[in-house]
């Protein structure tokens, strides 16, 4: 019987991959399949909390937990390694720690920052990408305040922060910044009126997923707390001084001691090397989340471009969608092991909340708009639920937001 066990290989321990494994380990016996999870880090991090760690309102250590803490060691083999190649036809995955065979493969390799080719953005701006970049950014911001306080010749740029992007990540980061700045000013004896936070967005509207009423609430709240918005203002370059923007056809230099890019992500760059038809690290999947020509390969999370039946555009890359995809794939792997056909993935939209710091927010929950403290509370519920869904009540109690 042991020789008949299928090899299930899962790449990535983000929301999608880890949800797949934690659901699958409960659904199958050790005789049915050998499950291997490969992740480049020994920890999982809550990607939707990175804006907090980046601003310094949450310690970076609170954003992560060991992958093995949520695994059943008798059912799942965890390998800390970096994937270097996926060979679909040979059913092999190459890593820096060896080669792994598979019968069923789940690709959930996550996201990296996308700068859209803007000159200098990768070199001169901080990215909100992982716990390492979050730690670097939060420390850099505090170092700038400390330097300003200690310097005899004050440089106002030390207290100036530029944020590129007024989408979800950018706005949530701005909200956390407005919570963090008063603490830093108090700690280092800095006049808060000297702090300058500017958000630059190329699109004509911020938070395009929300109504004008909710957007206006977010803008008013953040402006009241010191944020200046430059909407419909493309960033054409980034340098050591800050952003270069285009206004009425002319280039302008915006100066700041801290530049942050929060305007785009893409799927893993390994996707282009491993599959055809990949755009920005995402591949269009079939309705059961497998890919054309390979019924044994599932692609989920940030690497997946899932277009619901009857729709024209793929679903966005969110933690909620990734976790639902993980659940669906776990069920389908169980069905495959039972000799049954797979079922189509059906996304249930439970709503979206954008935090504006720890005390305010905007969102749509079950089709109804919410704002203010109610939205902030709901965001904490959503964050805690995500931890609970993967790690159970113990992890939710330890890492949750309550």
Swiss-Prot record:
Effect on the protein of changing residue 172 to Q: 12-fold decrease in kcat for DMN. Decreases the overall affinity for NAD(+) and the quinone
Effect of substituting residue 172 to A: 3.4-fold decrease in kcat for DMN. Decreases the overall affinity for NAD(+) and the quinone
One of the GO BP terms on file: aerobic electron transport chain
GO cellular component: plasma membrane
EC number: 1.6.5.9
Catalytic reactions of this protein: a quinone + NADH + H(+) = a quinol + NAD(+); a menaquinone + NADH + H(+) = a menaquinol + NAD(+); a ubiquinone + NADH + H(+) = a ubiquinol + NAD(+)
Cofactor: FAD
Record bears the keyword Cell membrane: yes
Consequence recorded when altering residue 172 to S: 6-fold decrease in kcat for DMN. Decreases the overall affinity for NAD(+) and the quinone
Compartment(s) of residence: Cell membrane
InterPro entries: FAD/NAD-bd_sf (IPR036188), FAD/NAD-binding_dom (IPR023753), NADH-Q_oxidoreductase (IPR051169)
Co-factor: note: Binds 1 FAD per subunit.
Sequence similarity: Belongs to the NADH dehydrogenase family.
PANTHER family per UniProt: 64 KDA MITOCHONDRIAL NADH DEHYDROGENASE (EUROFUNG) (PTHR42913:SF3), APOPTOSIS-INDUCING FACTOR 1 (PTHR42913)
Subunit (UniProt): Homodimer in solution. Forms homotetramers; dimer of dimers.
Protein name: Type II NADH:quinone oxidoreductase
Organism per entry: Staphylococcus aureus (strain NCTC 8325 / PS 47)
Lineage: Bacteria, Bacillati, Bacillota, Bacilli, Bacillales
